[in-house]
Amino acid sequence: MAGHSKWANIQHRKGRQDAARSKLFSKFSKEITVAAKMGDPDPDKNPRLRLAIKEAKSQSMPKDNIERAIKKAIGGDGDAYEEIRYEGYGPNGVAVIVEAMTDNRNRTASNVRSTFTKHGGNLGETGSVGFMFERKGEVVYPASVGDADTVMMAAIEAGAEDVESSEEGHVIWCADTDLNEVSTALEAELGESDSTKLVWKPSTTTELDLEAMQKLMKLVDALEDDDDVQRVTTNFEASDEVMAAL
């Protein structure tokens, strides 16, 4: 499990530091609109929409923005978007998965490819790095909900697969298809989570020093700046010292 909690932490650190809140909210809005369009606009009847709203709320997205995004779907918007996954290697051979939602496949592919090239990476075919990750559900709780044993018992009862507990909190993993049921059971036992979402969890990692991490983060930042890109995941491993120096 080494590195996975650090990997999760950098995702959260990035989210908190994202100065362009409007860009972040725009990505959440798109996900909410598409989720509502693909299923029921009632989150109680649409697990994907429920998770999208929960993640948006965890980043303090205003309720009005969320409601507007759902109304867009009811009004017919969201039809044009398709979900695409790009895979490739960043600098120093780090595996990178880019999840996009776009109304222009050619534009997005061109932008993602040029961003990889510009930052010392290489965009590959779909499946070129996917084998290094597993699709999992991830539920994050603050340390304040209880000690490791308490959370482990709740996780086992809820049907989760694994738990990582540290001073910073608890990360609970489950099968991707079980996320809605597991997160609902956890909430009944532990209260509302900090975060509940589907993720690509690295099964193998690449160790990076500070210089390599800085290069990688330039690529990740550039990819995340693209309006079509929803999410970027990598399989880096780094020491606490490197993470602290970023």
UniProtKB/Swiss-Prot annotation:
It is found in: Cytoplasm. SUPFAM superfamilies: YebC-like. InterPro entries: Integrase-like_N, TACO1_YebC-like_2nd/3rd_dom, TACO1_YebC_N, Transcrip_reg_TACO1-like, Transcrip_reg_TACO1-like_dom3, YebC-like. Residues 1-22 are annotated as: Disordered. The keyword Transcription regulation applies. One of its GO terms (biological process) is regulation of DNA-templated transcription. It holds the Pfam family TACO1_YebC_N. GO terms for cellular component: cytosol. It comes from the Bacteria. Keywords: Cytoplasm, DNA-binding, Transcription, Transcription regulation. Its main location: cytoplasm. Signal peptide: none annotated. GO terms for molecular function: DNA binding. The keyword Transcription regulation applies. HAMAP family: Transcrip_reg_TACO1. Belongs to the TACO1 family. This is Probable transcriptional regulatory protein SPO1072. It comes from Ruegeria pomeroyi (strain ATCC 700808 / DSM 15171 / DSS-3). The lineage of its organism: Bacteria, Pseudomonadati, Pseudomonadota, Alphaproteobacteria, Rhodobacterales.
